[in-house]
From Swiss-Prot:
Its EC number is 2.1.1.199. It is found in: Cytoplasm. It comes from Heliobacterium mobile. It is an enzyme of class 2 (transferase). This is Ribosomal RNA small subunit methyltransferase H. GO terms for cellular component: cytoplasm. Keywords: Cytoplasm, Methyltransferase, rRNA processing, S-adenosyl-L-methionine, Transferase. It catalyses: cytidine(1402) in 16S rRNA + S-adenosyl-L-methionine = N(4)-methylcytidine(1402) in 16S rRNA + S-adenosyl-L-homocysteine + H(+). One of its GO terms (biological process) is rRNA base methylation. It holds the Pfam family Methyltransf_5. S-adenosyl-L-methionine binds at G33, G34, H35, D53, F80, D102, Q109.
Length: 312
């Protein structure tokens, strides 16, 4: 299958990173290579780029997309949470001029129904971005305690019917394990009252999102990647993060705010005793969102938020 993925907020990312001919850039979620190709084009074909992705199919697609930049690109199969060790192994720690993290599932992964990311087609309950990952959605649904399933749905999906859905999942699995996306959708439809099913899009949307985040430990990966990205940047280098979920955006916002703080000593202290210095300058006080034009072309950009900061 051809890897189809439209890069979100592309012009905004280029404006944020301001690629230059002698620059070194890192795309922590290279996907189909759309953002990476545009970054390299902006460097007049002279810049260098390190591309990471844990999905081997995405990496193969990126290799094709970036073929004309082959001499300037280093592609590594790795989760972006390991970007610190990748950069260190390549001898580039503290030398990266711009880093992009585009968090979440790609449109291509959603299109590959057999991977179980979408509630619109029947497939095994997998949801792993890395096919070698340890835990599948089926294992969570069939093996985790009811309380833990409730927590996942409530925290990661912000699903108001989390408790009922978790109860219905456990009741169903005592009779027969949940094996397919259709099994899960049927349980969700049964758990959510009929009137509530008519609200806010597909009734399974939040549950599928929550399971995907849990299976891939997306929030944990982001929390590890942000400090590693800051260390990897050169002075004045920029970090651009695109998130699609309020929890992810909150993590990015709080990290930027914390790293932008300087001395925390009381105002009446004559000399700083804490030694804390700001490491980041926030470029986007409010997240950048997609234009009306982009929303028409790429519906995925509807929930996309871009935050940018610069290393001091």
């Amino acid at each position: 299958m051809e890897f189809h993925h439209i890069p979100v907020l592309l012009e905004e990312v280029l404006e944020a990173l301001q690629p230059r001919p002698d620059g070194l850039y890192l795309d922590g979620t290279v996907g189909g290579g759309g953002h990476s190709a545009a970054i390299l084009e902006k460097t007049a074909g002279q810049g260098r780029l390190i591309g990471l992705d844990q999905d081997p199919r995405a990496l193969a697609a990126a290799r094709i997309k970036l073929e004309k930049f082959a001499d300037q690109v280093t592609l590594v199969r790795s989760n972006f949470r390991q970007l610190g060790s990748v950069v260190e192994e390549l001898g580039q720690k503290g030398k990266i001029d711009g880093i992009l993290l585009d968090i979440g599932v790609s449109s291509h992964q959603l299109d590959e129904a057999e991977r179980g990311f979408t509630y619109r087609a029947e497939a095994p309950l997998d949801m792993r971005m890395n096919p070698d990952g340890a835990v599948t959605a089926a294992q969570i649904l069939n093996e985790y305690p009811e309380g833990e399933i409730f927590r996942i749905l409530w925290e990661y999906g912000e699903e108001r019917w989390s408790k009922r859905i978790a109860q219905f999942i456990v009741n169903r699995r005592t009779e027969q394990p949940l094996a397919s996306t259709t099994d899960l959708v049927d349980v969700i439809r049964a758990a959510i009252p009929a009137a509530a099913r008519q609200e806010g899009g597909h009734p399974a949307k939040r549950t599928f999102q929550a399971l995907r985040i849990a299976v891939n430990d997306e929030l944990g990966a982001l929390q590890e990647a942000l400090p590693a990205a800051l260390d990897a940047l050169a002075p004045s280098g920029r970090l651009a993060v695109i998130s699609f979920h309020s929890l992810e955006d909150r993590i990015v916002k709080n990290f930027f705010a914390e790293q932008a703080k300087g001395c925390t000593c009381p105002p009446d202290m004559p000399v700083c005793g804490c030694g804390k210095k700001a490491r980041l300058k926030i470029i986007t006080r409010k997240p950048i969102t997609g234009s009306e034009e982009e929303l028409k072309i790429n519906p995925r950009s509807q929930s996309a938020k871009l935050r940018v900061a610069q290393k001091i």
